[in-house]
Amino acid sequence: MLMDSLQEIICEKRTYTRLYHSHKHAYSQFLFPLEGSIDLETEGRQVKLNPDHFLYIPPQCEHRFRSIGRNECLVLDVPLHAMKIDEYRAGSGIEAALDPFWSSIRYLLTEEAKAGTANSLHMLVQYIKEKLQSHSYASIAYIHSHLFERLTIKKLAEIEHYHPAYYSSWFKKQTGKSPQNYIADLRLEEAKRMLMERNETLTVVSEALGFQNLSSFTRWFTKSTGMPPRLYRNTLYSDKK
């Protein structure tokens, strides 16, 4: 079911029933639970949305939702002409924790909903748009901070609340690479940086990069670059002379 297009920004409190409803709409929607939780499904993703998180649902994104028990949710509906987020960034929605920025936004939106006016909504929507454009995804941040640990699609998909089968295609939309290639490229760049900047032995470098021994590091690096790490380092030093 496609909801009609929207002309004006709407900010109001809503409640949901225990029965699942499904639809999509031609405008953006933000959900800020105030009480209780919302069970929500989009393509490849299942979320139990609580008051410490919010969810952005992009236009044309089919979603199912319900809430069991007492609930109240602050909802912001934004017409397409007022805010358009690039599809590759939005995917099937953005869920994030309420950090100080989003907590402030929720408070200001709540005040607008109480007043029943739209005086500041356009300005708040612009703040929200700028924030979303610079949004960083939790699983990508996790990769960077756990680069040389064992990383699985299952684990990364869980962080984003996606099904593993959907996660890889979603990830490629965000980065232009598969998760495996993205991780491999990051690891290789870090290995090159360490070989260039550090004076430690190759054994120490390989251990820092998470390899069990020097031979496995050498095989991996040679396969990735076409030359062994010792030759790569010597080439760097000779180029600097």
Swiss-Prot record:
In terms of domain of life, where is this protein from?
Answer: Bacteria
- Residue span, HTH araC/xylS-type domain: 137-235
- What Pfam families does the entry give? Cupin_2, HTH_18
Keywords (A to Z) from UniProt: DNA-binding, Transcription, Transcription regulation
- Cupin type-2 domain residues are 22-78
The signal peptide, as residue positions, is none
User: GO terms for molecular function, please?
Assistant: DNA-binding transcription factor activity; sequence-specific DNA binding
Q: Which residues bind DNA?
A: 154-175, 202-225
> Which chain positions lie within coiled-coil regions?
none
Q: Which SMART domains match?
A: HTH_ARAC (SM00342)
Q: What name is this protein filed under? A: Uncharacterized HTH-type transcriptional regulator YobQ
Which organism is this entry from?
A: Bacillus subtilis (strain 168)
Gene name?
yobQ
